[in-house]
């Protein structure tokens, strides 16, 4: 084995950053000299201000390029009516959220900060604490949600009440700037991050593409498509692979080279990206309820690997594409410019709030009457819900199961009303509710049969596809699963939710059981009482096309 001369290869060689920034302030930074070199001195207040503003902006606004992609769906003749309906709701939601009161999504996420600190930047230490203070200030002062649970022991948890801890990863680099990527990562999209340990045998044109298409299909719709999908093939370790997935889904590596070299530089395979995007469009899942727009775009990054390993990673950034860059240099603190006026992307003829044909459902009736009405319509029927809905999610369902297991039976409210899987953000002053969109339905699948057997949870409302056990339970017990659009939580809070009150377990915060009154709350029948599943029908349609 011959030796080669030393050559250092930057693993992720990026071109110039063309991101558009705005100056937050020129305070809290200064320039000094040490041993003949100019040093950028950054006060802790600068880090706190940067984190505070970045997470505020990302909670209420999205990138212009993302908004343009959503708007393009409305003009695409190949987009389904459901694609266009969902896209319009996203734009309306962004228009409301950009006012800075109701956040884009009720799951205001885990705060993730990736920082790269130049060697000629001095802060005096305590960077993580200063950044965490900024995250704290954002979540305390804005109408966001506290989603972090701290373990007291292996099984008992308590909500931290601040949305801390944040995930803060800081790196030392060359230069005299301090650069950041801030991500508000919701649970739905975070849960769609996967690592597969494969081998060299996968790395053939005939196998790799089909493999990635099948993995892409497993994403389903629970994480609020259209997605920004990222695949990473290779990596010097599993953790390097998944870190790259996260950053690629945030467009952080868009300026990588498009070919590799003998030293192991990362690169994008743009041709494979194009091919996979076409395959995503052909899946038929569309923007949640069937159609073309399962993905806005796809990134495929190839990394070097150990000869015995071939990690493959997959992840997404969802319709709440909350990624924002920031930096500190000698001019001051800079924040990436997001879209302040998303309403401009809504065509004039679609500015009025009319939703077209929908079946009106009065929920303030006996459950048997509501079920009988729903039974008249096929899956995919669009509904307009009006009346009382119970709101409960993961811990609430665990509490209800505990009651059933102890022989206590179910509370009457879970029998009399539909249940909406959700957890509200803080309620702004003068509003009936904070942002309150649906959470992922699949996490509650294991509870459905037991609940419905006791007359509860007969109508469920949430987002995304569900497992066969839910379809079987609904057929057995006469229940329904209704789909709500994942993503436009601000629209629902402003337009559909008229009141919100806690019913039980207030100590659980957003995981408590709530009651809401709604008007014209949009939903679709996804699973009915006859064993029909909307998403299974889409898959069968696609399989039939493949056979032909």
UniProtKB/Swiss-Prot annotation:
Activity regulation as described: Is inactivated by oxygen, due to oxidation of the Fe-S cluster to its [3Fe-4S] form. Both the fumarase and the isomerase reactions are competitively inhibited by 3-hydroxy-2-nitropropionate. The isomerase reaction is also inhibited by fumarate and malate.
GO biological process: tricarboxylic acid cycle
Catalytic activity: (S)-malate = fumarate + H2O; oxaloacetate = enol-oxaloacetate
InterPro entries recorded: Class-I_Fumarase/Tartrate_DH (IPR051208), Fe-S_hydro-lyase_TtdA-typ_cat (IPR004646), Fe-S_hydro-lyase_TtdB-typ_cat (IPR004647), Fe-S_hydroAse_TtdB_cat_sf (IPR036660), Fe_dep_fumarate_hydratase (IPR011167), Fumarate_lyase_CS (IPR020557)
Transmembrane parts of this sequence: none
Alphabetical keyword list: 4Fe-4S, Iron, Iron-sulfur, Isomerase, Lyase, Metal-binding, Tricarboxylic acid cycle
Gene Ontology MF annotations: 4 iron, 4 sulfur cluster binding; fumarate hydratase activity; identical protein binding; metal ion binding; oxaloacetate tautomerase activity; protein homodimerization activity
Keyword Magnesium applies: no
Gene3D superfamilies from the UniProt entry: Fe-S hydro-lyase, tartrate dehydratase beta-type, catalytic domain
Complexes and interactors: Homodimer.
Function: Catalyzes the reversible hydration of fumarate to (S)-malate. Functions as an aerobic enzyme in the direction of malate formation as part of the citric acid cycle. Accounts for about 80% of the fumarase activity when the bacteria grow aerobically. To a lesser extent, also displays D-tartrate dehydratase activity in vitro, but is not able to convert (R)-malate, L-tartrate or meso-tartrate. Can also catalyze the isomerization of enol- to keto-oxaloacetate.
Family, as annotated: Belongs to the class-I fumarase family.
UniProt-recorded name of the protein: Fumarate hydratase class I, aerobic
Species of provenance: Escherichia coli (strain K12)
């Amino acid at each position: 084995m011959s030796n080669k001369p030393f050559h250092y290869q930057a693993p992720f060689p990026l071109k110039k950053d063309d991101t558009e920034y705005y100056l937050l302030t020129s305070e809290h930074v200064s320039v000094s000299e040490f041993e003949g070199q100019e040093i950028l001195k950054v006060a802790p207040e600068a880090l706190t201000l940067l984190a505070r503003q970045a997470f505020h902006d990302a909670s209420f606004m999205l990138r212009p390029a993302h908004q343009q992609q959503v708007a393009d769906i409305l003009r695409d003749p190949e987009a389904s009516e459901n694609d266009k309906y969902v896209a319009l709701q996203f734009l309306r939601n962004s228009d409301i959220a950009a006012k800075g009161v109701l956040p884009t999504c009720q799951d205001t996420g885990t705060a993730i900060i990736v920082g790269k600190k130049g060697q000629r930047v001095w802060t005096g230490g305590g960077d993580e604490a200063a950044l965490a203070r900024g995250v704290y200030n954002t979540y305390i002062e804005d109408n966001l949600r506290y989603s972090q649970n701290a373990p007291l022991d292996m099984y008992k948890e308590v909500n931290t009440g601040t949305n801390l801890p944040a995930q803060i990863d800081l790196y030392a680099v060359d230069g005299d700037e301090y650069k950041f990527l801030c991500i508000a990562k919701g649970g739905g999209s975070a849960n769609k991050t996967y690592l597969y340990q494969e081998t060299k045998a996968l790395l053939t044109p005939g196998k790799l593409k089909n493999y990635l298409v099948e993995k892409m299909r497993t994403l389903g719709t629970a994480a609020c498509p259209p997605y920004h999908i990222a695949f990473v093939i290779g990596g010097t370790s599993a953790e390097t692979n998944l870190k790259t997935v996260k950053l690629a889904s945030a467009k952080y590596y868009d300026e990588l080279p498009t070919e590799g070299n003998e030293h192991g530089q990362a690169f994008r395979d743009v041709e494979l990206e194009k091919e996979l995007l076409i395959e995503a469009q052909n899946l038929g899942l569309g923007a949640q309820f069937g159609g073309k727009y399962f993905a806005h775009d796809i990134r495929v990054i190839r990394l070097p690997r150990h000869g015995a390993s071939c990690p493959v990673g997959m992840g997404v950034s969802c319709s709440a594409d909350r990624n924002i860059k920031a930096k500190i240099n000698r001019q001051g603190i800079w924040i990436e410019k997001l879209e302040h006026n998303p309403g401009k992307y809504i065509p004039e003829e679609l500015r009025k709030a009319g939703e077209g044909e929908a079946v009106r459902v009065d929920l303030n009736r006996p459950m048997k009457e509501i079920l009988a009405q729903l039974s008249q319509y096929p899956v995919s029927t669009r509904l307009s819900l009006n009346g009382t809905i119970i709101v409960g999610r993961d811990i609430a369902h665990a509490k209800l199961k505990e009651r059933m297991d102890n022989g206590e039976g179910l509370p009457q409210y879970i029998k009399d009303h539909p249940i909406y899987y959700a957890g509200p953000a803080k309620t702004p002053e003068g509003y009936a509710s904070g942002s309150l969109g649906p959470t992922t339905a699949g996490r509650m699948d294991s509870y459905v049969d037991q609940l419905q057997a006791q007359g509860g949870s007969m109508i469920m409302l949430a987002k995304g596809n569900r497992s066969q056990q839910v379809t079987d339970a609904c057929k057995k017990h006469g229940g329904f699963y209704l789909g709500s659009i994942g993503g436009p939580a601000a629209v629902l809070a402003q337009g559909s939710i008229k009141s919100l009150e806690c019913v039980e377990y207030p100590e659980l915060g957003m995981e408590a059981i709530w009651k809401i009154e709604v008007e014209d709350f949009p939903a679709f029948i996804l699973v009915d009482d006859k064993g029909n599943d909307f998403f299974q029908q889409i898959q069968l349609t696609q399989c039939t096309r493949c056979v032909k």
